[in-house]
Swiss-Prot record:
Single GO BP term: proton motive force-driven plasma membrane ATP synthesis
GO molecular function ontology, one term from the record: proton-transporting ATP synthase activity, rotational mechanism
Record's protein name: A-type ATP synthase subunit E
Keywords: ATP synthesis, Cell membrane, Hydrogen ion transport, Ion transport, Membrane, Transport
Family as reported in the entry's similarity comment: Belongs to the V-ATPase E subunit family.
GO cellular component: plasma membrane; proton-transporting two-sector ATPase complex, catalytic domain
Membrane-related topology note: Peripheral membrane protein
Length: 185
């Protein structure tokens, strides 16, 4: 083999090696680029998922705060409305003694007390009702500004509070409980 052929073979061999090196380098770079893109996509997907989760958490927090505020506003409005009704009821109760039905109502309260606590029960009627209450077995004192009776069994173990203001408070409390229970549903 001549020197020229040897040089030519070496050059060809070098060209082949160069092509192989370039091909390998290109393959490595392509692989690195693909890995880089995959990693970027993975990071992007992870970031998007975190953003969705954070967005959902923030949205839920905002909705919860809005619900709490709405309930508070609703409760305040209900309280305001109830106060209006209570004021109106108190105005009516201030004049209940002047109503023609009051003597019958008072006598009915006394009948109920005697029925449930016994004929010998102790009944207290407000002093202002002395004129409309039967006098036998009745004690008079300042028990309620609106009227009604307080009764107890002879031994004092059982009491019956039929004062007008107590009845009104009890009814109002029951109404509030029902309203607030419905609000929580």
């Amino acid at each position: 083999m001549s020197l020229e052929q040897v040089i030519k073979e070496i050059e060809q061999s070098q060209e082949i090696k160069k092509k192989e090196i370039l091909e390998n380098t290109k393959n490595i770079l392509d692989k690195m680029e693909a890995e880089k893109k995959a990693k970027i996509d993975e990071i992007r997907a992870l970031y998007q998922e975190k953003m969705r989760a954070e967005s959902s958490r923030i949205t839920a927090s905002i909705i919860d705060k809005a619900n709490i505020e709405a309930r508070s506003i609703l409760r305040n409005k209900i309280e305001e409305i109830l106060e209006g009704y209570v004021s109106a009821a108190q105005e009516i109760l201030r004049n209940i003694r002047n109503m023609p039905e009051y003597p019958a109502l008072l006598n009915k309260m006394i009948e109920v007390a005697k029925k449930y606590l016994g004929q010998d029960c102790i009944i207290k009627v407000d002093s202002k009702d002395k004129a409309v209450a039967p006098s036998s077995g009745i004690t008079y004192s300042n028990i309620d500004p609106y009227g009604g009776i307080l009764a107890s069994s002879r031994d004092g173990k059982v009491e019956l509070d039929l004062r007008v203001s107590s009845i009104m408070e009890e009814v109002l409390e029951k109404i509030k409980v029902k309203i607030y229970t419905r609000l929580e549903e």
